[in-house]
């Protein structure tokens, strides 16, 4: 588990984020020009923020609409399904949001925050599918992933200002997660 924490903590270092567009792509992919069509803006918003995650997954599997960019490197450098928690679908929607907002000229600090917040919502939704005893650990890790993408996400082509408050929040969420994990392991050991 310390490997996971180290992996999340070492995603990327940073300096000031521009309010203008940023080139945010899963590693090794090329921006899909057709995603920039203004008619696709409401469809993008719907898929990122309004449909259930399961609907997004079904649309992604069909590449519907084909003009949007559904490429993803899953959870980038963090584990995709840590401890068996099904985080990949949420990470895929997060990548979809970053790259299509970027292609549409709407990837701003504010929209990055909304997309990052939606990731936390999606990951916590996925946590409802895991064993009830593991749920607090899953939710705690979802919060760590959320703060990690707020702090480090979208940095392949941009630099983000170091934020002491965000660093403190990240450390707090990490400590909470570690405590939840320790409690889960203690309960698991007691129950045999």
Regions found by a protein language model. Give the residues of each.
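Extended terminal accessory/targeting regions
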Residues: 15-192
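Cleavable N-terminal signal peptides of Sec/SRP-targeted secreted and luminal proteins
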Residues: 1-16
